Amino acid sequence: MSIIYDDAPLEDRIHRALSDTFKHRAIETAQDVITGKRDALVAEVDNWEDFRTHAASIRDHVLENLDYYVRQFATNAQKNGAQVHFAPTDNDALDCILDIFEAEGAKSCVKSKSMMTEEIGLNTFLESHGIKPVETDCAEHIIQTAGNAPSHIVVPALHFDRTSIRNLYHEQKGYEGTNDPEEITRFLRKTLRPEFMNAPIGVTGCNFGVAETGSCTLVSNEGNARMASSIPETQIVVMGTERIVPDLRSLDVMMKLLVRSAVGAKISGSFSINTGCRREGEADGPKNVHIVIVNNGRTDILAHEFRPIDRKS
């Protein structure tokens, strides 16, 4: 299933984007901040390029042995109580996820930021079946409210500034506050908290799946991913086939690179390693975990010159 945000011809969209000076300024400012922070942190690491080379070798090793590691990950995830589903295509993934919603009788869910769900067009698909997905990442909530597509893989609302966000929430959500980011965040927290508490299903992505433990990891700066994966009774993890690392030691290497490279920080605000369903005596966590592993052309790429895409994704 493809996802369409704008029916206008490509040429019209290009001219519209090139003439939008507001978005140009917003994107340039945000990119300058992120790039500056990243460069400063990278300069503190003497062996940064060695780290990158080591991480690339880990990713290459996994891709060369992908069948083995996917099987190991799935086996260990099942031992932890999770149900693992394999989806060859985006439509297979959507049908699988819909089956889970229907089995649970669920008509809504909370979501954490996930480019995998963006790739398969999950929100549009769920809405077409009468299911309400609620984005809980601040930036994702902004673009969902605006009906926009993400403008950046890490910072999806890069094309908004604080004033446009304030005006958007005033028009769409009745927000009466200022354009102060902290005040807007407090409004979002108050708005989203009931959604977390009442949602029957939480949908998340997966930064890395750990083969030796069957764990799914989540990185966020707002804590929303942890809430989406711990409060609802059912969690659906949607991940690409290539998102596997062999073990926790390899995960450590990838994490040291990920946050520095993505947002110019030493560590994220929240990092979770989720291993299966809630166990007896535990106060939170989902009773049911479904892991949907999506191929959608990823293994086809391994045989071609574009193979490095799988390593870097």
Describe each PLM feature range:
Residues 313:
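Conserved small/polar residues in nucleotide/adenosyl-binding loops
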Residues 1-308:
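The feature marks the mature, well-folded catalytic cores of soluble enzymes
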